[in-house]
Amino acid sequence: MIRIFPSVFASALLTVTSLPLSRASNSAELGFELSRQLCSRCHVIGEYNRMGGIGNSPSFTWMVKSSDWRERFLTFYSRRPHPVFTRVPGYALWSDAPPYYPPFEITLDEIDLIVAYVETLRNSQ
């Protein structure tokens, strides 16, 4: 799978954090758990937090309606505002500016799990 990452990202330090996941039996369940832990502070990710999120952050159910939803989710870490606080091993930081949210680390495999969860939202529409 090809992942696009803008060349604007220079070099910097990665912050390593651990992400405990509950016991889930499949990719979509793991993706939901990751979404709940990492994304729900800004986005409505489904019925879990339908009254949550930040007002100007699009909900997962809204974003999945876009024809390029999969690419957007797979490359979210390179799309503003995510690069300031999202760390992906093997990719340089976007800026030396301090993050305005606590930074977190996510792997490309974990992003694939989130996409598996989001696909269930798309299929349920």
Regions found by a protein language model. Give the residues of each.
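Bacterial N-terminal signal peptides that target proteins for export
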Residues: 1-9
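Hydrophobic helical h-region of N-terminal Sec-dependent signal peptides
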Residues: 9-15
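Electrostatic cytochrome c docking/interface patches
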Residues: 15-34
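Positions in alpha-helical segments
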Residues: 29, 58, 99-101
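The canonical Cys-X-X-Cys-His
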Residues: 35-46, 114
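C-terminal capping alpha-helices of c-type cytochrome domains
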Residues: 91-125
